[in-house]
């Protein structure tokens, strides 16, 4: 593996605090392209991306989780919501997760702060499911299921890269568990 690529993986952190400075559109487009280029089972690509930059909509979205860090959306410059048509693929969760991971890593490589906000199987502050809460705000069709939300902004914190020696190599098993 290329050392530069490994450094991107080690540098990727969940960033929840943003400066308020806008993300340049060319960088946001690169993050989107990273998602669109994701691997997909049988190349079905059951997912759709909803990009939100409207400040009021981001504030409204910040209530999408009862617990967790969705409140950061109120201070984000953008969010990318990944939904997928579950009727198109039985691996829509996996395919959508690959999209999220690619975008999360690209954001890090570009110096953009990002954080994965789990949407599937979660509850919003008003008692709805996170999926129904987001569907009401973003009007995605009923056959589309919510996987996750990627919060994006210029980072207001600089977290250190993960030291390679702290990686859990004990979780690696060769030839048997």
Where are these regions (language model features)?
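Acidic, surface-exposed loops and disordered segments
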Residues: 1-177
């Amino acid at each position: 593996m290329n050392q530069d690529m490994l450094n991107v993986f080690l540098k990727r952190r969940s960033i929840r605090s943003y400066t308020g400075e806008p993300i340049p559109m060319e960088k946001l487009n690169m993050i989107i392209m990273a998602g669109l280029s994701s691997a997909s089972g049988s190349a079905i690509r059951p997912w759709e991306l909803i990009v939100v930059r409207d400040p009021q909509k981001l504030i409204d979205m910040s209530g999408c989780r009862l617990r967790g860090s969705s409140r950061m959306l109120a201070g984000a410059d953008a969010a990318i919501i990944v939904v997928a048509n579950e009727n198109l693929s039985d691996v829509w969760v996996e395919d959508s997760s690959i999209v999220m991971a690619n975008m999360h890593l690209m954001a890090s490589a570009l110096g953009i702060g990002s954080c994965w906000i789990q949407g599937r199987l979660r509850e919003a502050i008003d008692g709805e499911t996170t999926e129904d809460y987001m569907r009401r705000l973003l009007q995605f069709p009923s056959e589309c299921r919510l996987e996750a939300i990627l919060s994006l902004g210029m980072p207001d914190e600089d977290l250190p890269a993960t030291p390679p020696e702290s990686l859990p190599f004990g979780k690696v098993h060769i030839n048997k568990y």
